[in-house]
């Protein structure tokens, strides 16, 4: 992984970053996403929905530098060339979850196979983070498949330097002959404004609609 340093004094977002970082301003937005065609196509091809959604999320994240901007372990501001998903997997027996990361790949089939291999290896481990070491360039993704929701918010402790997005997916539901899932996006205002939240949602919806192009 490559971490590219941002020189704050020369950054065109310096004023906004300092203001919102000092305030520790984060926000969340939840939007229902139409997955009617997507769900049908995934089912026909014999794939699982969760890793397919993770792939679509990572395509948006890795396409846009703003979603890869963060602070590394050396307390340096910058952006990674690529992020990998760190996603939750629920264990029905223990009623707890594990967090597993998988290498991102632009090719869906390659990513899906890597996901399945990691899932087989680590899903039954009774640890919160069974696959170690966890690289710095990961982004949290989770799914709450038991309920659909109209809003969802996560709060990280004060003085946190975590700037990357956090994505949470809910249960899909039917309405007016269409199928939707709620997607909650948690962002840090120091690096992402409302425009960027809209960018994520719109591009995610677009890649979901164009599932024929990549599956």
UniProtKB/Swiss-Prot annotation:
Family annotation (PROSITE patterns): CAT (PS00100)
- Give the Gene3D superfamilies listed for this entry: Chloramphenicol acetyltransferase-like domain
Reactions catalysed according to its record: chloramphenicol + acetyl-CoA = chloramphenicol 3-acetate + CoA
Quote any Pfam family the record assigns: CAT
- State the active site: 189
Keywords from UniProt, A to Z, are: Acyltransferase, Antibiotic resistance, Plasmid, Transferase
Biological processes annotated in GO: response to antibiotic
Q: What SMART domains does the entry give?
A: CAT
Claim: Acyltransferase is one of the keywords in the record? yes
Per the UniProt record, which EC number(s) apply here? 2.3.1.28
A GO MF annotation of the entry reads: chloramphenicol O-acetyltransferase activity
Quaternary structure (record): Homotrimer.
The entry's function note states: This enzyme is an effector of chloramphenicol resistance in bacteria.
Family to which this protein belongs: Belongs to the chloramphenicol acetyltransferase family.
The name of this protein is Chloramphenicol acetyltransferase
